[in-house]
């Protein structure tokens, strides 16, 4: 795509900054759940929290939190999506050899799983070659798939979902490209919107950025995003959620504010705390209807060895 050509230098520069910040030795942060733990904050999902979340369903309304995936949608280079629909052996008329005049479509999907609405697993990002629970990348990451920290190990993520409307707190429909979201911003929004975050909750931030720009200005949408600062990721981790997400493709601000490390929110959440990241979530309706708590349900495709997965969680209230 022309987008990739246009933004390749910017993205390369950001990656160089990130790599330069991670070449030094990193301290091992062991899991709260033991040396053999591979699912991190998903350990916080339990029957009591699931039952409590189910009680949030008052109107019987369900809403898809995954946006539509369009093969033409820009993605972080070199990621892409290609879909082919075929009719093997029959092409609408040829005899399928099944004893009746059947016709069918099949599909072939070629894509990077870190595209569109997605779940970042604990094997996605580390620092200096080290990942969640002191796992060394060279020991579990192979071209054929991860042997630890993979998507297929994650149990269904079910619990209380919480929406924090950052755009409303800022008095705008959409935050601007690269606009930082600090812990003070999050705390102020929580106070104004009477939002509390409990252990095991799934926290979603609404910036309005995807609703405003994905279709109207895809190059802007893919080139930079508003997002949390490094210290805001530490604050969010201190709330002990199961997952943190936003309606942007990266969660942290890109480019980062001065003094921050690009994408380092991923290290804080994934590597240091085992907290999952949800990207490009469809939060617009929740914000428009002031739905700040809901039941969240996610059962991702269990592709063995996968790092990430395209997802469509459901919010119910």
Predicted regions and their residues:
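Short non-domain terminal segments
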Residues: 1-2, 16, 90
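Bacterial N-terminal signal peptides that target proteins for export
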Residues: 1-12
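Active-/binding-site microenvironments in catalytic and ligand-binding cores
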Residues: 26-317
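Bacterial N-terminal signal peptides
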Residues: 11-21
